[in-house]
Amino acid sequence: MDTIHYMMDNAGYLATLTFQHLWLVLLAVGLAILIGVPLGVLIVRHKWLATPVLGLATLVLTIPSIALFGLMIPLFSLVGQGIGALPAITAVFLYSLLPIVRNTHTALDSLPPGLREAGRGIGMTFWQRLRWVEIPMALPVIFGGIRTAVVMNIGVMAIAAVIGAGGLGLLLLNGIGGSDIRMLIAGAVMICLLAVVLDWLLHRLQIALTPKGIR
């Protein structure tokens, strides 16, 4: 009950931290989509690049999050941004690349060869086939990677509070520092709720964007 009262009494503060957390995650994952999907297309077209690119993305994901955030501090200190949102967004961007690149590569690489041949047969260019045939067919799997990146990094971004990024991780950090169980539970609950709601919204968006014939 104490936790519920705490959340009700601090609803405005919780809302501010939630929107801050959401903005940080969506910006990082959005950048990863802009880079990761074209990178996935590139390694399908140039297959020799697949192993090094996916290997490097996998290597980044194996670095413990607290260590990666720590590595960002001296790097961004060179431009006067050692703590705050910029190093946190960069770290989460790097974490987001693997599921997006891998799912894009897997989805496009597993399409039936006859699909591409049919496109060539009617005179489509590579970009036309990609835009009108291949991406729509691969969209459910690509979206699966995006959803994985978002849900995974909602939790990862909470750790970014230790480098001054803000967000819901502040509740966990301050709760631990002050031995306040209410803040710890409130932070954990809000992070879980945010992950569940975003995953549901992305699932609905995936359904809306996927062609009816392959739903």
Where are these regions (language model features)?
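Hydrophobic alpha-helical transmembrane segments of polytopic membrane proteins
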Residues: 168-204
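Alpha-helical membrane-interface segments at transmembrane helix boundaries
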Residues: 12-23, 54-61, 73, 77, ...
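Transmembrane alpha-helices
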Residues: 127-159, 186
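Short cytoplasmic-facing helical segments at TM-TM junctions of multi-pass membrane proteins
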Residues: 103-142
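Cytoplasmic-entry segments and transmembrane alpha-helices of multi-pass inner-membrane transporters
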Residues: 39-72, 92, 97, 102-106
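Transmembrane alpha-helix signature in integral membrane proteins
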Residues: 14-42
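Loop-to-helix entry region at the N-terminal start of transmembrane alpha-helices
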Residues: 16-24, 71-99, 139, 183, ...
